[in-house]
């Protein structure tokens, strides 16, 4: 399902490959205090079971550092080998040096070049973290963020901009500084001897247009696999739409090797929502398939009944319910496309484009529902049992279409 991808080295984070021709990986991050081993382990398991292929956790103090090996041990005891990424700011060099078991337990280090200190201390702290990564054979994500830019670098670029015949806006210079911060750290790590197969790069902002510009620049200036994400995307529909709007143009250009959707969860929503949204973005773009899809129309004046809406909802629920068993028994079932349409205008055509689809009668239409499979009329359903009959047909189709080859 992959389109043309920007060529990069492959970086292994644990057993998960990032970059090259490998599928775009979905990441997430815990929001529990890492020092709370029980809560953090439970959330990592929850995120992983929802589909997160890599999970990041903050390592912000000594108690968090001490907790990491035990979190890893408990995950392995559950048979879960999801890679863990340590997120370091301000004191990462100290923690990695003092707690070697923590460093060994992590599968990748995230280093923010804007939170390493100032002046020569910044370079020393960065070099120490890179040396530890090299000694342990760990990959590193150099992750810059416009909310924590190095003020010295920003001042340097602002001064340079002021001497231009036609200075750029302050906002443009901030974006340039963000890219420069990431690229300089990337080049410094390479000069220290960290291999290209151990480096991932990111530079995050909170506006969609800015993110597209920044990542096009990173793609132009480096060969590194890129971690995409709109930082502080926000809550609910706004956060989902902003993330999709920011990531889609880049992904369609072949830019991006792993993604995270940084939603602010509402108190009523699970942390796994960000994983679900990331998967939906990749699936909507045709880049990966995680679960069967249901295509359904929005309804109009021709669809006076809510039956097609109820059926679409029930089909979606049933597919989600059956997916764990289907995935184990029927390879490729994630590619399944089901159509539930509300009237004769687009119903038959959309149903023919799906693997299996039903075109329900609209207002004033004859009370019958043709079902199509692989583009051909399979049967016509009538009466009160249309919903259950269609669900049975979907089940039969899966068993036939996706049965393992003998």
From Swiss-Prot:
InterPro entries: Dihydropteroate_synth-like_sf (IPR011005), IspG_bac (IPR016425), IspG_bac-typ (IPR004588), NO2/SO3_Rdtase_4Fe4S_sf (IPR045854). It comes from the Bacteria. It is an enzyme of class 1 (oxidoreductase). Transmembrane segments: none annotated. Optimum pH is 7.5. The keyword Ubl conjugation does not apply. It catalyses: (2E)-4-hydroxy-3-methylbut-2-enyl diphosphate + oxidized [flavodoxin] + H2O + 2 H(+) = 2-C-methyl-D-erythritol 2,4-cyclic diphosphate + reduced [flavodoxin]. GO terms for biological process: isopentenyl diphosphate biosynthetic process, methylerythritol 4-phosphate pathway; terpenoid biosynthetic process. Optimum temperature is 55 degrees Celsius. Pathway: Isoprenoid biosynthesis; isopentenyl diphosphate biosynthesis via DXP pathway; isopentenyl diphosphate from 1-deoxy-D-xylulose 5-phosphate: step 5/6. Its EC number is 1.17.7.3. Its cofactor is [4Fe-4S] cluster. [4Fe-4S] cluster binds at residues 297, 300, 343, 350. Keywords: 4Fe-4S, Iron, Iron-sulfur, Isoprene biosynthesis, Metal-binding, Oxidoreductase. GO terms for molecular function: 4 iron, 4 sulfur cluster binding; 4-hydroxy-3-methylbut-2-en-1-yl diphosphate synthase activity (ferredoxin); 4-hydroxy-3-methylbut-2-enyl-diphosphate synthase activity (flavodoxin); iron ion binding. Binds 1 [4Fe-4S] cluster. Gene3D superfamilies: Dihydropteroate synthase-like (3.20.20.20), Sulfite Reductase Hemoprotein, domain 1 (3.30.413.10). HAMAP family: IspG (MF_00159). Converts 2C-methyl-D-erythritol 2,4-cyclodiphosphate (ME-2,4cPP) into 1-hydroxy-2-methyl-2-(E)-butenyl 4-diphosphate. Belongs to the IspG family. This is 4-hydroxy-3-methylbut-2-en-1-yl diphosphate synthase (flavodoxin). The lineage of its organism: Bacteria, Thermotogati, Deinococcota, Deinococci, Thermales. The gene is ispG.
């Amino acid at each position: 399902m992959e389109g043309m991808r920007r060529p990069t080295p492959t970086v292994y984070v644990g057993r998960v490959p990032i970059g090259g021709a490998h599928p775009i990986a979905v990441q997430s991050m815990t929001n529990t205090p890492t020092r709370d081993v029980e809560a953090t382990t439970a959330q990592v398991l929850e995120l992983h079971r929802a589909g997160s292929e890599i999970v990041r956790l903050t390592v912000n103090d000594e108690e968090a550092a001490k907790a990491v090996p035990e979190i890893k041990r408990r995950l392995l005891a559950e048979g879960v080998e999801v890679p863990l990424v340590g997120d370091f700011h301000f004191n990462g060099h100290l923690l990695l040096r003092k707690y070697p078991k923590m460093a060994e337990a992590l599968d990748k280090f995230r280093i923010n070049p804007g939170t390493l200190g100032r002046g020569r201390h910044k370079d020393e702290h960065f070099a120490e973290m890179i040396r530890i990564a090299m000694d342990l054979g760990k990959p590193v994500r150099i992750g810059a963020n416009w909310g924590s830019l190095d003020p010295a670098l920003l001042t340097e670029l602002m001064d340079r901009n002021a001497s231009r015949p036609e200075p750029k806006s302050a906002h443009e210079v901030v974006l340039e500084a963000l890219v420069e911060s990431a690229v300089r750290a990337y080049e410094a790590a390479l000069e220290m001897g960290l291999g290209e197969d151990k480096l991932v790069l990111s530079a995050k902002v909170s506006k969609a247009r800015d993110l597209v510009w920044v990542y096009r620049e990173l793609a132009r200036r480096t060969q590194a696999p890129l971690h995409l994400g709109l930082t502080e995307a926000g809550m609910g529909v706004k956060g989902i739409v902003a993330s999709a709007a920011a990531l889609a143009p880049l992904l369609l250009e072949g830019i991006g090797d792993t993604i995270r959707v940084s939603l602010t969860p509402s108190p009523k929503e699970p942390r796994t929502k960000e994983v679900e949204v990331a998967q939906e973005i990749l699936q909507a773009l045709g880049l990966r398939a995680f679960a069967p899809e249901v295509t359904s129309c929005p309804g109009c004046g021709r669809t006076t009944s809510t039956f097609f809406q109820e059926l679409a909802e029930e089909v979606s629920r049933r597919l989600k319910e059956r997916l764990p068993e289907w995935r184990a028994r029927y390879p490729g079932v994630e590619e399944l496309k089901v159509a539930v349409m509300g009237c004769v205008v687009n119903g038959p055509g959309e149903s023919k484009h799906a693997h299996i689809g039903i075109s329900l009668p609209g207002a004033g239409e004859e009370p019958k529902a043709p079902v199509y499979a692989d583009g051909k009329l399979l049967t016509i359903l009538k009466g009160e049992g249309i919903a259950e009959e269609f669900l049975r047909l979907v089940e039969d189709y899966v068993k036939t279409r996706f049965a393992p080859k003998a």
